[in-house]
A protein has these predicted regions:
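Short hydrophobic beta-strand element within catalytic cores of glycosyltransferases
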Residues: 286-289
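Conserved donor-binding/catalytic core segment of Leloir-type glycosyltransferases
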Residues: 183-207, 213-217
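Acidic anion/phosphate-binding donor-loop and adjacent secondary structure
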Residues: 130, 155-158, 172-192
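Membrane-proximal helix-turn-helix segments that form the acceptor-binding/catalytic region
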Residues: 123, 128-146, 159-160
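Carbohydrate-associated surface elements
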Residues: 39, 152, 171
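A charged, aromatic-enriched C-terminal amphipathic alpha-helix characteristic of glycosyltransferases
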Residues: 29, 182, 331-357
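Conserved acidic donor-binding segment of nucleotide-sugar-dependent glycosyltransferases
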Residues: 300-316, 323-329
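N-terminal strand-loop element at the rim of the active site
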Residues: 5-12, 20, 24-75
Length: 370
């Protein structure tokens, strides 16, 4: 199997984590897996053998989907991609974000094997995607089967590309987040002040840190000793009582989730899935999330969510939801959230992806026999 990621694997990101997680699952299932992406391998690469990884070159930051995407551009990166495709006669090529002008699009153009493409984007209205769908119709036609990580992502594929995709959610190594034998506050004393945790890129407005900070005055009136921890890339000036940790390693992130009293996901737009919400659910920390459809779906629906949902962009609603979550603590909702999270373990999601592979390979085989 050949897996292609358009973004640098050594830069934290949801798509990158999915490629590495899927590669680990496929290797565990006995498949020979090769990975192509810009940049280098991260320290935690889910056991991927460096000999099975090829870089298309150094990544540069390009604005895309409200974020800064670390991609490799230019003729040299494209030539490296074409050489990799030619050198690895894979049974199936799986490209992620196939229309991003990086390794995925170049690999799609050079593909001779059956192709599965995963779409992660949740941009509701995108002139760039519409133009890409028209200008790159030939490349899109090379895709044998499309996967969307959520109904939201599937709608984007239908609207902009005029084709359908099967929904297969993102996967997670749930066991890495579950620590039933650990202190639920990860060593913090019983009398420690309540801790609120935000994970995400501090400089991206769609991640909603501004909404959380706007809610702080109301939260401090109700909880004067509240501690707010912000972890993730990007520098940001924070008010007193807030602590910025910057980018943290995966193991430290898991420890932070276990140590928090409430995890807050105040995102405002363009989220196709919400992997940080899933990580919090698996960790057993109470979740407060904006009412974006993917977040509500992860939490089991808006009617009786396994967490607290608030109206996106509304600081007062966020503060009220956090106060309720702090008063409830860990209990029925967090146990239900953990149970829901197990549905997204790679042991469940991985076989669904492999099932798509099997259908594509069977169709190609039937075409060859006819």
């Amino acid at each position: 199997m050949g897996l292609v990621c358009p973004y640098a694997l050594d830069v934290p990101g949801g798509v990158q984590n999915q490629v590495l997680g899927l590669a680990a699952h496929l290797r565990g299932a006995g498949h020979d897996v090769r990975v192509l992406a810009p940049g280098g391998l991260p320290d935690e690469a889910d056991g991927l053998d460096p000999a099975h990884f090829t870089s298309t070159g150094a990544a540069v930051g390009v604005r895309y989907n409200g974020s800064v995407a670390p991609v490799a551009l230019g003729p040299l990166a494209a030539a490296r991609t074409r050489r990799w495709v030619a050198a690895h006669a894979v049974d199936l090529l799986h490209v992620h974000e196939p229309l991003v002008p990086s390794a995925s699009l170049a690999a799609l153009g050079a593909a001779r094997s059956p192709v599965v493409a995963t779409f992660h984007t949740a941009t509701p209205r995108s002139r760039a995607l519409r133009l890409a769908g028209s200008a790159l119709a030939g490349a899109v036609d090379r895709i044998d089967a499309g996967i969307a990580v959520s109904p939201t992502a599937r709608d984007v594929v239908r609207r902009h590309l005029g084709r359908d995709a099967v929904v297969v959610p993102n996967g997670l190594d749930v066991g890495a987040y579950e620590r039933p034998d650990a202190d639920v506050r990860d060593g913090r004393s019983a009398g420690a002040p309540p801790r609120l945790l935000f994970l995400g890129r501090a400089g991206e407005r769609r991640k909603g840190l501004d909404v959380l900070l706007a809610a702080l005055p109301a939260l401090r009136r109700a909880h004067p000793d509240l501690e707010v921890v912000v972890a993730g890339p990007g520098a940001r000036a924070l008010p007193p009582g807030c602590r910025s940790l910057g980018l943290v390693e995966e193991a430290d992130k898991r420890a932070l989730l276990r140590s928090a009293d409430v995890f807050v996901a105040p995102h405002t737009a363009r989220e196709s899935f919400g992997i940080v919400v899933l990580e919090a659910m698996a960790s057993g920390v109470p979740v407060v999330a904006s009412d974006l459809p993917p977040f509500a779906a992860l939490l089991g629906g808006a009617e009786d969510p396994a967490g607290r949902l608030f109206r996106r962009g509304d600081p007062a609603a966020l503060a009220a939801a956090v106060s309720v979550a702090l008063s409830e603590g860990r209990g029925r909702r967090t146990e239900r959230a953990r149970a829901l999270a197990r549905r997204y373990d790679w042991s469940v999601v991985g076989p669904e992806v492999v099932g798509v592979y099997a259908e594509v390979l069977a169709e190609r085989s039937a075409e060859g026999a006819s």
